[in-house]
Amino acid sequence: MQGTDEAPEFKCKCCGLCCRRDPYYAISLLDIQNISMGLGLRPEIFFSKYCEIVTTPGGFRYSAILAPDGCPFVKEGLCGIHFVKPIGCWVFPESSLLPVTDLKKHVNAIPTCGILGMADNDQALKADYELLAARDVQFEHTKKYYEQHDGFEEKTWREATDRLIEKLGDAEEISRRAEAIRAKASALIDRSKNRSVKW
């Protein structure tokens, strides 16, 4: 992972609680391709068996893996689709960009998470900013797809996914976005430091 040298690195304890706490897990158009290929299923079959289109509290429509009893791909506490897991899972918990001390307050609902055992720190976790940029591109395209389509349909999904893959191949765009995320992370850290100085 790329990040600042002094940034603490998260070490997952593989407790699996983060995979069992939400009723659904958002997935991108590319996630649908990767997971369905990993499972040996046609995308439409994967989608109809495991997914639904959900509307977020902000009013955005996304595809999501339904998880009323936890992610259906967790096996014995571990991810059964690790090598093709959703982009949102790849970037958790680094995607928060919060300083470790603040992040610990947000994950206290996951009492076995490795973050809670980390020393307080005013730095964000070491993060791969290019991967975070790719995540943003994937979900922007996914959001746009569901603004234009009422449901999942393999032909239009394939066309949209091909455009998404082309966009992800734009190294200059990913680099620009990664720098913007890095700047946002620095601003969050500075804001946190200023708050702690006032106390």
Where are these regions (language model features)?
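Short loop/turn segments that flank or connect secondary-structure elements
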Residues: 1-199
